[in-house]
Amino acid sequence: MKAVAVFPDSREVKLIEQDEPIITQPDQVKVRMLDIGICGTDKEICAFAYGTPPAGADYLVIGHEALGEVVEVGAAVTHLAPGDLVVPTVRRPCAHAGCRSCRAGHQDFCETGDFTERGIKGAHGYLTEFVVDDAQYMNLVPHYLREIAVLVEPLTIAEKAEHQLYGLMQRRPPWIDPAVSERRQGRGHTALVLGAGPVGLLGAMALRNAEFETFIYSRQQEPDPRIAVAKAIGATYLSSQTLPPSQLEAQIGPIDLVYEAVGHSLLALEVLRALGPNGIYVLTGVPGRQTLIEADPAALLREMVLKNQVVLGTVNAGPHDFGAAISDLEIFHRRWPGAVRALMAERTPIEQAVERILGRPAGIKSVISFQAA
């Protein structure tokens, strides 16, 4: 069967043939992969910035944003059946008995760093025709979300952040009314999203859905499909080409929440200065190797203390976040069908996957499909 693999030692990315996997344990399922989303992590792995093959292997099959169809189940699997659509989770727990998070099924909060991640660290990914995995890591997706369900995994980043926000926002007046659900926690608050890529735009949809007044700050200028999506969901778009970070507060007013989705350290620090009193700053992007920057850490820390600010780093996602992403994606598709569809580029067949991954992006979210013509 076909797969896209990275060979770190020889610095190659290529389409390979490998044996089709078989079920060996009663709690496993076999999944035919349908769509694989390509993100910045995949591109960085293909540029050999990181990525770790499984033990004993000289290559890593990439791909972690995935949608598949169950084709076979083990004897002990009762909650899934052939024909079901599933989105798999990415991270697998470490083996340390003392890691409370992994033992509780929350490996997204692993305390040891010895987790594995499909397609990223120590385990092959999903950019291959078939996968066998434990059924517990499969999230059931309704068939009517078939065309957009590959967006579930990138949406989980925002869902995890939003779930944590609900507790953090209770720490300060005006406290959230206990009668107000987590899905309405943004009412009366202003959010700024940094970046108009898939994670940023999906995060903006989640914030709009939670009733935040939402601004998106990125480098694109009109005409651009990202700006069209921002406007379609009722967010206000601001371009960094015409509005420097130093003027954000004057333009927007007090910023209650910053949702960072760019992985650019200088921009992140510049925008931190614009965070309002009692504000929360959520970091989701992972900065790559960048040139050294000048900063005044004393001033930043002083402002954080004097303004009661919180900076939160968040990575990966747990079972709750996948469930929330599936539910919210259905809501987004109902509220903004055109905007959700606009996130998806034309699907690329597996035979052209390497060229697509190594080349310029096509649309907002590149998708490799095993069913593309």
Residue ranges and their predicted role:
Residues 1, 269-272, 318-373:
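C-terminal hydrophobic helical "lid"/dimerization subdomain
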Residues 21-36, 51-100, 142-144:
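Glycine-rich beta-strand-centered segment in the early N-terminal region that forms part
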Residues 22-23, 59, 79, 151-154, ...:
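Residue-level "contact hotspot" at macromolecular interaction interfaces
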Residues 95-190:
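NAD(P)H dinucleotide-binding glycine-rich loop of Rossmann-like/cofactor-binding domains
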Residues 157, 199, 222:
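Hydrophobic/small residue at the entry helix of a nucleotide-binding pocket
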Residues 175-179, 183-196, 208-270:
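Adenosine-nucleotide cofactor-binding segment
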Residues 265-331, 370-373:
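Glycine-rich phosphate-binding loop and adjacent beta-alpha segment
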